Amino acid sequence: MNKKVLLVLCDGMRPDALTNCQAAQKVLKNCVSTMNAQTVMPSVTLCCHMSLFYSMIPAHHGTKGNTYVPPSRQLLSLFDVLAIEKKKVAAFYSWGQLRDLCYPASLDYSLMIKGGNYGYEKANDRLTDAAIGYINQELPELAFLYLGYPDEAGHEHGWMSEEYMRSLENSWENIVRAMEAIPKDYAVIITADHGGHDHTHGTELPEDMTIPLIFAGAERDLVDNLENVNIIDIAPTIAALAGFAPNADWEGKSLLK
């Protein structure tokens, strides 16, 4: 198997909010998904991203908050594993702490637009533009697109607020735009790092811990049982799509048949 992958992560996206998101519903009509995947605890952004890309629980990668803690031994993330195999990988993001998701030399291309300066809505739009252009020109094996607007809206206005719902609509409009613009043989995986409640997250509440995992591209028919899915299962699944075995240290499982 040799599928190229676009991985989109909407920071703070609650699955129950997608019911009223028109752009999301367009995609969900023709996909394979679970709205009951689980993230890790503590349910905060950097910790959850580390668990996604390193496929292990926070106690094992060492970052248990939004401050990066170098692992006590050498670990390889999804980016690193693909880079070792000479595969082209790229990242587009608006939150600077995500720079620590791999060794610096593992990324062929990296674009960070500071959401706090430019605004997360504008950052969503510009990062999507950049990802579309790069994918169509370079055809990377993995492109990671981080859309940070929902988390920003949740903290400022409250999860499930009108502004939060608008941030989801913007994010999904960008997802639809990307899906329509890139080659149709790309796998497209859409997920979140955590949810949220009131103006915060980080607890064991279901609103914080439950995330969607959506397979919306060329990989739809390859996905197997989506029961008991955890965020640490995403990296092994992408590795399998790319044709590689998971790293020996990874703790998640592939979700492919």
List the predicted regions and their residue ranges.
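Feature captures the catalytic ectodomains and active-site-proximal regions of enzymes
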Residues: 1-257
